[in-house]
Structure formats: structure tokens, C-alpha cells
Regions:
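Anionic N-terminal interaction surfaces
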Residues: 1-32, 94-96, 103-113
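Acidic Ser/Thr/Pro-rich low-complexity disordered segments
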Residues: 38, 43-51, 84-95
Length: 124
């Protein structure tokens, strides 16, 4: 695992929580553990502000992968989860997916995330 990611989530991991795999795409990261999924959203110009979110494995409902077309620069991953509440333009709350844009050159890593999410959270 990337040492920077490991450092950023070390304080959040439980004693018996193990990292399955971690991925970084541009500045943001996703970390899969035996307990669930962490997302690290790097914010600001300096990148010193990082929002860490955790989604328990039991809240993960589905995953989608959208491939890049000829003119796209990235592929999209969306993980549907309960508890990631957002408000739409009409003021109505909904469960927003965890959403990542992945550079086309890292598409294989994105496919690996799909496999790991299915294996560890959706096949139980």
C-alpha cells in the first residue's frame, strides 16, 4: 500500500482491521478493508486538507463501471451505498453513490476495484 495513504488512514483503522487494497487516482484514493471502504478526498490547492469517509461493508449495495469512449479521458466507477446522504436541487435527500473518475490509463485498476468490491462486500 502507498505509504501516504497508509499514513492518512492509520488513525482510523481498528486493531483487527486489515487493508485489502488501496488505489489512488489523480489526488483521491479508495481503500478497501475487511470492514468496508474508505474514501480520501484531497481538497484545496495545497492538498493538505483531506476528507476521509468510511462506508461499512454492510452498506454497500452495488457497483458500476463505465468504460471510456474514444474521446473520454477517464472511466467511471460508482459504488451504491446506504448512508451517503446528499440533497438534490429540489431539497430532497437521497443516497449518493461513491463516485470516482479514473484516468483511462488506470482502467485495469478500476476493473480490479469492481472485482474486489464484488468479492468482499457483495457476495456475502
Amino acid at each position: 500500500m502507498n505509504n501516504n495513504i497508509e499514513h492518512q488512514i492509520a488513525d482510523y483503522l481498528l486493531d483487527d482491521e486489515n487493508v485489502i487494497m488501496a488505489f489512488t487516482f489523480i489526488r483521491d484514493s479508495i481503500v478497501l478493508t475487511n470492514y468496508g471502504i474508505y474514501t480520501l478526498d484531497v481538497q484545496g490547492i495545497s492538498g493538505k486538507k483531506v476528507e476521509v469517509k468510511f462506508f461499512p461493508g454492510k452498506n454497500i449495495k452495488s457497483i458500476s463501471f463505465e468504460s471510456a469512449s474514444t474521446f473520454d479521458l477517464d472511466v467511471d466507477i460508482k459504488i451504491s451505498v446506504d448512508g451517503n446522504t446528499a440533497i438534490n436541487q429540489n431539497g430532497i435527500p437521497y443516497n449518493a453513490p461513491i463516485s470516482f473518475k479514473v484516468p483511462k490509463k488506470q482502467a485495469e485498476e478500476a476493473r480490479e476495484i469492481v472485482k474486489l468490491v464484488k468479492m468482499h462486500y457483495l457476495s456475502r
